[in-house]
């Protein structure tokens, strides 16, 4: 046995950045269409909710506590968005270059990447985040006059999710993959699936399909 140590060299980890966003629009059958790159992504803010405590009392003392179901939400911020996002934001094209709002909002999946660094290297690895079964709420758009300190409009959308099944676990709508703990071949297989290749489209697999892909790849010698 050894005494605990803190802040050893190479063990001061942190996470930063948001990049490589991918949108996976959901079609009328509930399946995801091919992924499209999301340029201009500036932030993704995770905002889980729920898991609220219900206290139970018996014999004049606290007997137990129950927790409500947990929900996963997130906010996307960006300078722009792909055309495929418009139906997810409640817009419809009615003529060339003409769109209308207040339409049915299309579901979607979304993935993005954050960077892991430490005190030795500011890019030790990456984490791939995936959200399934999402819908976006209407958001404010603020337009202002151009002045001597111009700035681009930042769009923002609050997104909610409905969980999907995961074999052997409770349903979930979010997965986080720490690439630094996986073989390079496994990371490439995940990226090829989510981002596509020269011969295959970018697709969004289910949680079970991703888990199988990872476990099969990690099990190979």
Q: What do the predicted segments below correspond to?
A:
Residues 62-137:
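Structured, beta-strand-rich domain cores
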Residues 1-46:
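Polar/acidic, low-complexity leader/linker segments enriched in S/T/G and N/D
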């Amino acid at each position: 046995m050894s005494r605990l140590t803190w802040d050893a060299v190479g063990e001061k980890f942190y996470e930063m950045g948001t990049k490589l966003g991918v949108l996976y629009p959901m079609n009328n059958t509930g399946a995801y269409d091919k992924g499209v790159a999301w340029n201009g992504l500036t932030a993704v803010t995770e905002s889980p909710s729920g898991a609220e405590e219900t206290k139970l009392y018996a014999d004049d003392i606290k007997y137990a506590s129950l927790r409500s179901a947990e929900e996963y939400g997130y906010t996307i911020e960006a300078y722009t968005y792909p055309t495929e996002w418009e139906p997810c934001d409640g817009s419809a094209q009615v003529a060339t270059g003409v769109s209308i709002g207040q339409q049915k909002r299309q579901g979607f999946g979304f993935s993005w990447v954050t960077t892991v660094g430490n005190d030795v290297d500011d890019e030790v690895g990456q984490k791939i985040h995936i959200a399934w079964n999402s819908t976006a709420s209407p958001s404010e758009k603020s337009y202002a006059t151009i002045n001597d300190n111009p700035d681009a409009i930042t769009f923002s959308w609050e997104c909610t999710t409905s969980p999907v099944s995961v074999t052997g676990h409770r349903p979930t709508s979010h997965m986080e993959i720490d690439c630094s703990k996986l073989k390079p071949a496994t990371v490439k297989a995940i990226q090829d699936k989510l981002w596509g290749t020269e011969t295959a489209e970018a697709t969004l697999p289910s949680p079970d399909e991703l888990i199988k892909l990872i476990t099969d790849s990690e099990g190979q010698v």
